[in-house]
């Protein structure tokens, strides 16, 4: 069954259809949230909040074909709320938070830490655009829907952000 068909069924209250379409995005949602928030617990909480909100609000989704950008918009908002909580709580990121992320070897851990360091040099908006592109695989048009920017602005910011990261990583 195609994604739009599953979404149509989910809009009618079919829980299995919702789970099937949600499961297609779960790992990408988690990757985005993890790199955006910096630790496993907050990422898991944001993805869970996103799933709950998406399930409760799916009947309001006008275009089943837009499910991808719609669910990432929900996660984008969940992550923004989590960041506000982090600021209030003055959370500090600890290397222990990264031990639960599977890695093939020590080199993978080093590379992941280098990427996190490079991402930390970007503004929240730049980081979101890069993560939506790289971890979620969204196109400029879809990122524009999630962030509220124009597709041209997204392409420009993505290019500049990737250049900043490249400079940081070399």
PLM region descriptions:
Residues 31, 45-52, 56, 65-77:
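Structural recognition of an alpha-helix C-terminal capping motif at a helix-to-coil junction
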Residues 81, 89-112, 116-117:
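Internal acidic/polar
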Residues 7-31, 121, 127:
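A short, charge-rich alpha-helical start-of-domain segment used by transcription regulators
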Residues 80, 126, 135, 141, ...:
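DNA-recognition helix of helix-turn-helix
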Residues 19, 47, 144:
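The alpha-helix within a helix-turn-helix
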Residues 59-63, 73-93:
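Arg/Lys-rich amphipathic alpha helix in sigma70-family domain 2
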Residues 11-12, 49-66, 85-86, 168:
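Sigma70-family region 2
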Residues 24-27, 35-38, 131-138:
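Short helix-capping/turn signature of helix-turn-helix
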């Amino acid at each position: 069954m195609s994604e739009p068909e599953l979404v149509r069924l989910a809009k009618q209250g079919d829980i299995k259809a919702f789970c099937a379409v949600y499961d297609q995005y779960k790992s990408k949602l988690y990757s985005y949230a993890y790199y955006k928030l910096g630790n496993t617990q907050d990422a898991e909480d944001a993805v869970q909040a996103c799933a709950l909100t998406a399930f409760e609000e799916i009947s309001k989704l006008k275009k089943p074909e837009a499910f991808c950008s719609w669910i990432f918009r929900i996660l984008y908002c969940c992550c923004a709320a989590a960041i506000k909580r982090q600021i209030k709580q003055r959370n500090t990121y600890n290397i222990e938070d990264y031990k639960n992320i599977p890695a093939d070897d020590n080199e993978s851990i080093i590379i992941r830490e280098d990427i996190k360091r490079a991402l930390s040099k970007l503004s929240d908006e730049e980081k979101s655009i890069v993560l939506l592109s790289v971890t979620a695989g969204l196109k400029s048009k879809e990122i524009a829907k999630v962030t509220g920017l124009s597709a041209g602005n997204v392409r420009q910011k993505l290019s500049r952000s990737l250049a900043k990261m490249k400079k940081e990583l070399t």
